[in-house]
């Protein structure tokens, strides 16, 4: 059998797929030829198969370096569910388990060993020397670079692998890395003339929406309505601070939403419990800081919300990538305010890599303020160009309409000028709205001619308009002067009537009714592959129930048994024999033998 046929047969037998995704076959062939590689592939794009399949085809054990115990656990469970011998050597095991794992590695009974960078460095002169290693895979490789968004110092020592094991190929994998990070990965790992594979970063199943100028109460209301529209679907809410994760979670819990909290300030036990509850669908939502997510391989996360502006496009892209890993339609929402921008600018200015972090934040700001296709901006950031708009972001769905906003701009700039440019955004809105706040009255600003000049415009709309004015360059924020607003020459031209100002019309969504929150998710979304009708929905729910029952029996996450995508395909194909069940994409030989009878018997009840 030639190499290509062997690769395809292994893919079908263990993973249940008839064909490779773009670049996978090329990457696997390259690794089988004992060559180093750097693989950039989006979350859900099939990175893992790029090293798991070569591990199955080569003699010996593949050593996979992974930064999180939870990520190792998830990967190992998925491999075992596919009938592949795998294990994870880490501190969560007891000593007996680790002794058994070491013996299995030395005896060649494992095809893949997952290990943390710290553990690998401790074992490089001991266990690794006694093993027959087929390849090294460095997962989440961006952690090696100080320019990356998840820098881990211990990753920088991975360069010793090529020195000690010069004949063993190394493949580094990441979902997000700009050019400078890619170069740093290659240099620090001492990769030997590596080939760099860059897959498309496009995730067309993920919708992109930005909501600007929302205050806390408005955000909370919008989030509740969003969750109600999504029924019981799983989602993640990312917040900038630990305190905010807890206040948002408490708000959701009071509304009866099953919600957990995850941040670095909680105990390891608490974080593990939250993650396990989420993976096993015991809670619907996790409110988290950026500490959450890298260890999540949950394929049926249907939405991601950013409560605050992320610090970089890399962080943002990786976090929205938690949604829709199964390829089904998923939604993301980013809330953006001037307060976020001011705070993040302060953090970036005080960081060790001030210039780089400010540049990354500026690119994130440009994305949030864009009035062109947002997906094109994301793809362009990662060096990928496209000539077509996506049709699945808020800009494409509702192209911005402009109006003559000269008077609005003049009111704002006049208020700034009359305070001698000594006010911040919040105080400016108080003046324009005519609010007798303590700060307004304390400084006598209620006597200004512009006091109350904009009371007909809601606070949220003022936030949006001021964001637009900042983007248009009518004023700047003096971050080193208590965030005071300074009028630019362009702003002066508008203020004194020398030029006009065009602003974008703010679009307001209608609120979801209380009745609407109980409405079932539309079948067209649940069954995007063409199935329709209540009977299909009933079958899908029955399949989901059986999957949960089987998963609970084995103490596994439900998506490890079968993904939502596979359940949808079962709804459409309705196999009535075990052989037909095994033909479904995503069902390998092991799962066919293990689960085929139960699922086929259930499907027959709907067919006969």
Q: Model-flagged regions — what are they?
A:
Residues 1-7, 356-358, 387-608:
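Accessory DNA-binding and partner-docking regions appended to nucleic-acid-acting proteins
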Residues 3-14, 18-22, 26-48, 56-58, ...:
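Helicase motor core with emphasis on the C-terminal RecA-like subdomain
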Residues 31, 227, 278, 368, ...:
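Short helix-to-turn junction characteristic of helix-turn-helix DNA-binding domains
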Residues 166, 231, 371, 421, ...:
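Flexible coil/turn residues that form the inter-helical turn or adjacent wing/linker of helix-turn-helix
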Residues 353-382:
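Short, charged low-complexity linear segments at domain edges
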